[in-house]
Amino acid sequence: KKKNIRFIGDPQKRIEEDYLRIIRFIRFKIMYDTKVELTTSDIIKQNLDGIKKISKERILIELLKILDIKNFLNINQNSNLKEIFTKIFPEFLYLNRLERLKKVYNQSEFNRDILLGVLLIDEKDNHEYFLHKYNASNKIKNMLEKFSKNLIKLKNDKHFFEKDLIKNAYLDGKNHLIALNLINFSINSKVKEKDFLKIFNKVLKIKVPVFPIDGEYLKQKGMKEGQSLGKVLKILEKDWINNNFKISNERIEEIIKIS
């Protein structure tokens, strides 16, 4: 039998002391999968405006803790809790996508980055509003923007997970592609589970190439330390990638001379 979860002391007083306790209360409710007393739920709803008095930084810290809880995937099963959560975080427009994510998330490591991508990204830049509202870190910003950019690429490029797979794994990493596949499946109802699994297994099996040239190699070829060395490395790497991760000694010499 599930236990009720409640505030210690008078809920109204405890909430008024620090409105962040509302979000913490939700976190514990999700973590322990416990019931919320109706009276407690009503008091929380009556005090939701108080959350506006809390700094966005403090709210974001609590939100990220919530998204780290695996039980968050079941939030749609509790209409009362879902209602409170969506009133606090109205930018999470796509909680319904969790139902598709639940079908496949066991295939890879569950993490908050995937959840943020699933719940925020759409074709209207909803994630950008979230980033601005909560003054999110550069790490979160770069992660969401990378997911958004590659979801657009994936939509427009039928070769993204096919002949360009190794190239994309080299550029963005296998973990990113695994997460991207999960997000794309959750967002796009047209993607079949068997196709998701096919891509997932392909990503797992590929061996990511290692660029064989570094600064020391170029110095041995007579180049000096400086900006030009870094520039040549980038040109060589691009040529190597575009030539199916191969480059001849003759081509290396040619690029060094041109540069």
Task: Describe each region flagged by the PLM.
Residues K45-R58, L131-K153, K202-P209, I258-S259:
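Short, mixed-charge aromatic SLiMs
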Residues S148, L218, G222, N243:
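Hydrophobic, well-ordered secondary-structure elements that form the walls
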Residues V191-K234:
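C-terminal accessory/binding modules appended to enzymatic or scaffolding proteins
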Residues R6, Q12-K13, L182-L197, I213:
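Conserved, surface-exposed functional patches that form binding/active-site neighborhoods
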